[in-house]
Amino acid sequence: MIYNFIDSLIEGKFQKRLNRFVCNVEVNGESRLCHVPNSGRMKELLLPETPVLLQKKQGKQRKTDFDLALVLYEGHWVSVDSRLPNKLFEILVKKSLLPETSVAYGAEFLRREPSYGRGRFDMELMSTNSDRILIELKSVTLVQNNLALFPDAPTDRGRRHLEELTDSLREGYQPAVIFLVQRDDALCFAPNWEMDEAFSKALVQAQEQGVAVESYAFKVTPEGLNYCQRLPVTTQREVE
């Protein structure tokens, strides 16, 4: 296990999503407010009466008692926390768990959230050749027929990230976009052409220009997450 939940998760049932970041869950027979740490649609996951696991959270500024952590889908636990991939990939780098074919293999971790252009990326690394690597991480929860797909909702922000990663090539950076699949039933990753053609085209163009595109899947349990495998990436419109 490379990532463990600090406290035991609490069982519940999903009831209804109220907005992007708040839902109702049933805990011990009572309806409670719960924070949804993911702005994606997740329509195939968040169905009434679906078993979920929650993290108990406290704070004076909080309006909810829990964070939604895991959702059970067709016998597989799915981690829906979009903040988690940053922690997961940092662990993969620092513990040298990435395969030799990864752009970040053997790289040194430099810092989180480096500034670039009009915004920030998720992290910056230094390769064994002293090249600066800019990393943008994407959380993936959607899998159809063993194919992991991103995004599950249109994302102008995601498209801009790809364009800025491509721009960084001219300044000598080695940029990469990494799709972390927080479930273990995917065998391949692809952009979601049907949901967001503009993002998908931008991903193809970025890869053609030299942006590294990688994807990794994780085994999810009520105790935590473990690295599962690197997934092949296809950018074709249709996958046979």
UniProtKB/Swiss-Prot annotation:
Q: Which Pfam families match?
A: SfsA, SfsA_N
Q: Which InterPro entries match?
A: SfsA (IPR005224), SfsA_C (IPR040452), SfsA_N (IPR041465)
Give the signal peptide as a residue range, or say none if absent.
none
**Which molecular function term from Gene Ontology is one that the record holds?**
DNA binding
Q: Which PANTHER family does this one have? A: SUGAR FERMENTATION STIMULATION PROTEIN A (PTHR30545:SF2)
Identify its protein family: Belongs to the SfsA family.
Annotated protein name in UniProt = Sugar fermentation stimulation protein homolog
Q: In which organism is this protein found?
A: Natranaerobius thermophilus (strain ATCC BAA-1301 / DSM 18059 / JW/NM-WN-LF)
Gene behind this protein: sfsA
